[in-house]
Design a protein with these regions (language model features):
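A sequence-composition feature that detects small, non-aromatic residues
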Residues: 14, 36-37, 52, 74, ...
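Gly/Pro-rich turn-and-neighbor structural signature
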Residues: 1-67
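Generic structural motif recognizing short loop/turn segments at the entrances and edges of beta-strands
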Residues: 25-30, 35-40, 50-53, 71-73, ...
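Aromatic- and glycine-enriched beta-alpha-beta binding-site module
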Residues: 56-123
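Context-gated lysine
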Residues: 19, 30, 47, 51, ...
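Residue-level detector of solvent-exposed, low-hydrophobicity positions
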Residues: 13-14, 46, 87, 111, ...
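Long, contiguous internal "core" modules enriched in hydrophobic/ aromatic residues
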Residues: 98-155
Length: 155
């Protein structure tokens, strides 16, 4: 399945929205190419969205386990509002074709730029309920996640 038309449409729509919110026509674009991959980065800066990005990475390679020809596409958008009380938005979709199989995944995250203790306690309690519903140990999962995603400068 060729996803180019879809990805190009998403990029165009996102950039139009970023420009409209920031009241600008300017888009910074960089494209990096190597034999197996292309990375396109688009950035809109302004007084509402300090930085809003949408980037696409394409990679054509061999699957490391099967040796099958593999095409990988990732589309990422990250939005950093100027107002620190508005959360950062991250959106990622990925599409891979390998060995005659197609895989599609995605995720979205909203990250508060200024942690509010009441909100963090509420979110933790709700996440604990979800973990318990599925028979998981919330504290063990939280500890595992904190070691995977911990940066020294956060200390």
């Amino acid at each position: 399945m060729d996803m180019n038309e879809y990805y190009n449409g998403v990029i165009e729509e996102a950039l139009e929205g970023f420009k409209r919110v920031n009241n600008t026509d300017q888009v910074e674009q960089k494209i990096y190419e190597v034999p197996a991959a292309t990375w396109e980065i688009n950035v809109v800066r302004g007084k509402v969205l300090e930085k809003a990005t949408i980037s696409r990475v394409t990679l054509d390679t061999k699957h490391p386990v099967t040796g099958d020809d593999t095409h990988f596409d990732a589309l990422q958008s990250k939005v950093y509002p100027l107002n620190p009380k508005i959360p950062v938005l991250i959106f990622i979709i990925e599409h891979m074709v390998s060995g005659g199989k197609t895989f599609f995944s995605g995720m979205m995250d909203v990250i508060p730029a200024v942690p509010i203790e009441d909100d963090l306690r509420f979110l933790g309690a709700e996440m604990k309920k979800v973990a318990e519903k599925h028979g998981e140990d919330y504290e063990a999962l939280r500890q595992k996640g904190s070691t995977i995603f911990k940066l020294e400068q956060w200390e």
